Amino acid sequence: MCANNKPSMTWAWMPLLAICVVVTCALCTGCSAKTASSSSTSKAPEKARPEDNPAVMLPVNTYELAGSVGVDGRQGVCCEGDYYWVSGSTTLTKYDRNWNMVAQNLKPFDGYTIEVNHIGDIDVWQNELYVSAEYFMDGVGKNIQIAVYDGNTLQLKRTFPFEPASGQLECSGIAVDADAGAVWMCSWVGEESGRYLYRYNLKTGAYEGKVHMQMPPQWLQGIACYDGCLYMTADDGAADDNEPDHLYRTSIKPGATSCTVTLERTFDDVTRQGEIEGLTFDKSAGKLLVLYNRGARIVLGMPKGFYDGYDREISEVFSYSITKHR
């Protein structure tokens, strides 16, 4: 017996309830069919949360080690046409496709109006080298410069004015995004400076703002633009513990103030763990090129002695064949 002691009223309503159930189920079935039909012809909307979107949170490429070559320079690498360029802390060197040296500048700081002593990662566009230069000592940078060099003579052509109000305290890498008309810079120094990417106008050199990285990598060393994304190398593995360094990826939408960073590749296949530096993409060959140093102990970003078995630092460019996932 029902708790309300009114069984006659409950049974009286059953036929009407049955009709309602049948009608309701018919309507629901019709909606489901319509929804299924619509979804089969329309593209699913992009998920707003990065963690729900595999296209954002997973690597977009596979990178297979193809080889390595020793180079004269421990900082950065770039590629255009038939040539490669490598930066040392105080040198610029040009190579042909077979890694034969073509030209070298051992005094790249001639022509600066303020004191600089360090070159970081580099990039090239229309045979002009874009160089991140500064005065760097024991983990502290100052006198940051965006410098442009001739790709043939390796001589300084011009510099862009740096914007101190940006909050950038160091310049470890630089990348040209020609499609967006932008030059991007990254900072090796952590805390607030290392959490942002800094944008300048490619034509005028004017500062255009900064983008906050969500899940920012630690100790950024290089940055490069490829296939609509920005890729960054980070010296975030402890060489003393044989920990590998990493490649990260992000995509910045027009007008965005922040971007999500994704782990793209772990470099556990280099000759020996040391210090990762700059990177570039050889688009004609479909390869990623990464500069790696080994042998020297690095303290606050500077070589301080050597590991057992080494009496000098060895700089190598590792090449990786790229296969797109989608």
Language model regions located:
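Blade-loop segments of beta-propeller domains
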Residues: 101-136
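Short loop/turn segments immediately following the C-termini of beta-strands
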Residues: 89, 134-136, 187-190, 235-238, ...
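A short helix->beta-strand "capping" segment at the edge of beta-propeller domains
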Residues: 48-71, 261-263
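Repeated scaffold domains used in trafficking and secretory/extracellular systems
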Residues: 71-78, 113-123, 165-176, 215-224, ...
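Short coil/turn segments that connect the beta-strands within blades of beta-propeller domains
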Residues: 81-82, 126-127, 179-181, 227-229, ...
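Loop/turn-rich, solvent-exposed surfaces of beta-rich toroidal or solenoidal domains
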Residues: 215-256
